[in-house]
Amino acid sequence: VISNQEESKYDVPQGVFQIGQGMAAPTLMTWGQPEHHERYLPKLVSGEEIWCQLFSEPAGGSDLAALRTKAEKEGDDWIINGQKIWTSGAHYSDYGILVVRTDPNVAKHKGLSYFFLDMKSPGVEIKPIKQLTGGAGFNEVYFTDVRIPDSQRLGEVGQGWQVALTTLMNERAAIGGGGGGVNVDLAYKI
């Protein structure tokens, strides 16, 4: 909330850091390893790296249990195939937080795993969705044989639902704090 209020004072566009600072950072802090904290958190907090959230899919919308994007283990890596939609800011993000299906043979909520990935990885294709206004804040993101190391997994394999709940709990605070920033901004301008 404080970060959003300060950004608003200096006309930083609303929402640019909400996913990284408000959702990815708390998830990394809760579920990440010390090396994740050292490498990613400083650049998240400083705004040097922008993050997006890769959760919603065309067939299931925001119903995570219905997602179809899959990851298959190959040695020390995972191969990701599938599609996400309505991804805010993917076209300018450096990293993304991603929930995928790693086990199709168990209950839907139990077959999920949670990763983060470099949005410039080979096989990641980002297509902005043009709005009526001409802008494109949302994107479709396609994954074709995207290889990511197991070290970019948060939580255990099959624990993606629990990790995603951490993200979603913080999403409410991040979005709510954005409104507080706007209110502070208006107070300064009045």
Predicted regions and their residues:
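Active-site-adjacent elements of ketosynthase-type condensing enzymes
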Residues: A59-L67
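A short, Trp-centered hydrophobic/proline-enriched beta-strand micro-motif
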Residues: G47-F55
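Glycine-rich phosphate/pyrophosphate-binding beta-alpha loops
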Residues: G60-G61, I85-A90, L132-T133
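Glycine-rich beta->alpha junctions and the first turn(s) of the following alpha-helix
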Residues: G123-I190
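Internal helix-loop-helix
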Residues: V1-E48, S88-Y95, E171, N183
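A structural signal for short hydrophobic beta-strand segments in well-ordered beta-sheet cores
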Residues: T69-E72
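A short core secondary-structure module
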Residues: N81-K127
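Short Ser/Thr-interspersed hydrophobic loop/turn segments at strand-loop and sheet-helix junctions
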Residues: S3-S8, V100, F116-P122, T144-I148, ...
